[in-house]
């Protein structure tokens, strides 16, 4: 995939970049793997705003992705590489030998016609899914489970990857994309390779309207709000925040204040915290 640049024909186009979508082979998704996606606009079941900066955007359909990769021993062949509006990574449609079709995250380097399999006996090549105990030390992986059989939860964004560092008893040491080293049960599955579409982070949105197409609403500074809306609000003109440290909209210290629970159950599985910690 390459980055496409635009000529500065307007202020919005100046500096804008996008993907050239060279890897995408079709714009027609598999209908049997689509599900309706009801947009909530950041509201809960009482209609109250619980997640800011969400709302609007283009209508989407959800693509049902196989994060479990539990179709053991049955080879599949990649039929298409597709764009997914619900995630940064591309997805691949796999046709299995028994006739079933499933979407998987498209790893870097996968192409139409590539054969993928799952299970303890699968080869160590991009797109194959195995239990961590069967993956050699030093292998790059993605789509990692935290509980056996639950489906991949870690390392799913475009361009991300993790690395198997070692094996200790029933756990496997994995270095995540953030630099954190974590112990994960050896029965959990992971997919070989790096997630594709690695140029995604280099894309320049270019204008506010493009964020609105994606369902992202504006972020407003607290200092321009009223006192009842934000701790930084109020005052005459451009007033300072009037506090010894910046605050979140809910009155909690921010910008460097640690928010992780002191007694988090997952602490015992973290061997080394992420790089900036």
From Swiss-Prot:
The family database entries (Pfam families) matched by this protein are listed as: Ribosomal_L2, Ribosomal_L2_C
- Kindly list the biological process annotations in GO that this record carries: cytoplasmic translation
SUPFAM superfamilies, A to Z: Nucleic acid-binding proteins, Translation proteins SH3-like domain
InterPro entries from the UniProt entry: NA-bd_OB-fold, Rib_uL2_dom2, Ribosomal_uL2, Ribosomal_uL2_bac/org-type, Ribosomal_uL2_C, Ribosomal_uL2_CS, Ribosomal_uL2_dom3, Ribosomal_uL2_RNA-bd_dom
Q: Which UniProt keywords apply?
A: Ribonucleoprotein, Ribosomal protein, RNA-binding, rRNA-binding
Recorded GO MF terms:
rRNA binding; structural constituent of ribosome; transferase activity
Region entry Disordered, spans: 38-58, 219-277
**Disulfide feature:** none
Choose one Gene Ontology CC annotation of this protein and give it.
large ribosomal subunit
Sum up the protein's function in the record's words: One of the primary rRNA binding proteins. Required for association of the 30S and 50S subunits to form the 70S ribosome, for tRNA binding and peptide bond formation. It has been suggested to have peptidyltransferase activity; this is somewhat controversial. Makes several contacts with the 16S rRNA in the 70S ribosome.
What's the subunit arrangement here? Part of the 50S ribosomal subunit. Forms a bridge to the 30S subunit in the 70S ribosome.
Which family is this sequence assigned to? Answer: Belongs to the universal ribosomal protein uL2 family.
User: What is the recorded name of this protein?
Assistant: Large ribosomal subunit protein uL2
